[in-house]
Amino acid sequence: MFMVLFGTVVIAGIVGYISEKSGFTQLVLASSGGIDSAVVCKMACDAVGPTNVHAIRMPSIFSTSHSRDDALLLHQRLGCWDYEVEVEHQSVVNMLNTRFSQHRDDPANLVTAKLKAQAYAGVADENIQARIRDVYVMHFSNAYGAMPLSTGNKTESACGYYTHFDMNFSYAPIKDLYKYQVMEIARGAAEIPDNIWQKPPSAELAHGQIDEESLLSYAILDPIVRAYVEDYISTFARFDRWV
């Protein structure tokens, strides 16, 4: 019941921000088929009505078929506008590597040395996908007049588990919700397909990527983050293994 009330407060916040500060009547967000974007999409539809919400699916080669299907099913259940734009990030990466290799004959050049040693950072290939998605959402916002929503939660922000420059949005509905709170809201929302909150959370920026393998289990991580952020526990504090 508490999380239902909490979700209602968040929805009221969206309505208040739109009506009093933003000047927008339409909302746009990136919808991946994951739990965070599903909850934000649900809140947006409850706040302004589904016909005023534009959800963009932007799959890449790493997106699973069930994520695509889950996002589409969510949009159909909510009744919001659905769009799909493929993220062709590899062609962008290849173009950039070519352009940045202009000094390939000079061994002192940073790019030349990195490519020759095959020390090119794979994380760059992951992050550019998120940034391309950001460009698509912001273009939709600028071109058609819809306020862009962030889908980041408090746990990710506190841990720095997001792509830099991928947070360029006007409003972040779940920025004060820990992951476990987002999960509770998702479980209580009939429109959100069960598979969205039952599957392991993943950014899907690489094959087989799972959030909790990069971080910790959210059941362990959330209480620790909350202790640091809200209870001001010292960074030198130690936690029992069961936490």
Sequence positions of predicted segments:
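ATP/NTP-dependent adenylation/nucleotidyl-transfer catalytic domains that generate, transfer
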Residues: M1-G33, S37-V243
